[in-house]
Amino acid sequence: MKFKDLRDFVQQLEQRGELKRIQIPVSPVLEMTEVCDRTLRAKGPALLFEKPTGYDIPVLGNLFGTPERVAMGMGAESVSELREIGKLLAFLKEPEPPKGLKDAWSKLPIFRKIIAMAPKVIKDAPCQEVVIEGDDVDLAMLPVQTCWSGDVAPLITWGLTVTKGPNKDRQNLGIYRQQVIGRNKVIMRWLSHRGGALDFREWCEKHPGQPFPVSVALGADPATILGAVTPVPDSLSEYAFAGLLRDSRTELVKCRGNDLQVPATAEIILEGVIHPGEMADEGPYGDHTGYYNEVDSFPVFTVERITHRIKPIYHSTYTGRPPDEPAILGVALNEVFVPILQKQFPEITDFYLPPEGCSYRMAVVTMKKSYPGHAKRVMLGVWSFLRQFMYTKFVIVTDDDINARDWNDVIWAITTRMDPKRDTVMIDNTPIDYLDFASPVSGLGSKMGLDATHKWPGETTREWGRVIVKDDAVTQRIDAIWNQLGID
């Protein structure tokens, strides 16, 4: 099922019993977090708070609170279908040369479809039905959540930030949290390696002292939102990828005050600039690790204009100790990652990011081992192949007889197939999430790889143990008489 905009998605979710309208007043200050957290942990529906205390704009929460709703948002009928999206991305990331004319002809429709999904720019857009400018701009009109009691201020969480570097042909989409610090100012918390920060740095180098145009879309359609957090190849824009997911071209509109193009059906658009050198201390905030992060300095985004649909919906979330929405997103997107990794490393049989590992800080890989040192090659490949795993602190590699998604299996492999000294790989001075206060230096820390595979000659001089396997014939005989044994 495909969705043309957020409202269409909300309507379809409600028809499926996957969305609940909350018609009593609930405050965006702490209360919505509590309601959403309980609902997410119970694998409950998306929530539309129709009467946020003190506001006229409804709040949509827990939208991607189950892997199934993430899959729906990406146009898939089930989580398992996300593997097909991963296969498409793997092909687009590194397309294989055709083996012949027939093979080339079979691949032609894919490239035709990609070309056909180039974004469509329109003039009259729903997101510009209402325009607020100048001194009338006031972010206090938005029911921005204060998620935790120790949070310093309200926090915009699902803003889709649109930027464009001076030397780039296409725009960058990124989701960065934004602390509200005034009527028309927020702090843009983007890390130095993220696309928005790179665009800003290039702008400052080419246009020193000049304001950097930025736009933020709130409440875009689900395909566009999820496209921004998916490992899309550099050769494919997030807008075009969203079109592939939606099976229809993404409609864009030029902003009123800059040349950036934003989703035409988004609920709310913030337009403005970042003045080079204008910085502010951001935080502390409770984040996806389950802790409050330390205060750090980031650029200030000045909002010059707000445009929105008539009767807009404000899309929001919270982050905290897993499970939270980012963790659920990680569970679903895990299925997209597997084919991409397998394209580069065919020996990988499964890849799993445990949600309790904060979505990306730990990975478990199962593989068909073929030679001594093979597991170490795979773990180094995981760290280096996709940008999404540059912050993964722990990689556990096991044989393919282990279920990567069953901790009983994984712990058994670690404790029976590993020597702590021989089979542990430590790498120092690597990129680490700035939110990781356990690292000795902000943004720089170590990584650990655990080789929990069977050891080959050359890796050990000892006779390796054989796994105990039950006798199939005996198992079948006992199955046949089990009910007669009277064992409950």
UniProtKB/Swiss-Prot annotation:
List the coiled-coil residues.
Answer: none
Report keywords, A-Z.
Cell membrane, Decarboxylase, Flavoprotein, FMN, Lyase, Manganese, Membrane, Metal-binding, Ubiquinone biosynthesis
Top EC class for this record:
lyase
Does the keyword section mention Lyase?
Answer: yes
Which cofactors must be present for this protein to function?
prenylated FMN; Mn(2+)
* Gene Ontology MF: a single term: metal ion binding
Query: Quick one: which residues bind Mn(2+)?
Result: 172, 238
* Catalytic residue positions: 287
Q: What EC identifiers does the entry list?
A: 4.1.1.98
An annotated GO cellular component of this protein is: plasma membrane
Q: How does it sit in the membrane?
A: Peripheral membrane protein
The residues the record assigns to binding prenylated FMN are 175-177, 189-191, 194-195
Substrates-to-products reaction catalysed = a 4-hydroxy-3-(all-trans-polyprenyl)benzoate + H(+) = a 2-(all-trans-polyprenyl)phenol + CO2
**Pathways per UniProt:** Cofactor biosynthesis; ubiquinone biosynthesis
Q: How many cofactors are bound and how?
A: Binds 1 prenylated FMN per subunit.
Its BP terms in the Gene Ontology are:
ubiquinone biosynthetic process
Q: Report the domain of life of the source organism.
A: Bacteria
Q: Which PANTHER family match?
A: 3-OCTAPRENYL-4-HYDROXYBENZOATE CARBOXY-LYASE-RELATED (PTHR30108), FERULIC ACID DECARBOXYLASE 1 (PTHR30108:SF17)
Q: How does it assemble?
A: Homohexamer.
What's this chain's function? Catalyzes the decarboxylation of 3-octaprenyl-4-hydroxy benzoate to 2-octaprenylphenol, an intermediate step in ubiquinone biosynthesis.
* Family matches, as NCBIfam families: PRK10922.1, UbiD family decarboxylase
Tell me the protein's name: 3-octaprenyl-4-hydroxybenzoate carboxy-lyase
Species, as recorded: Pseudomonas fluorescens (strain Pf0-1)
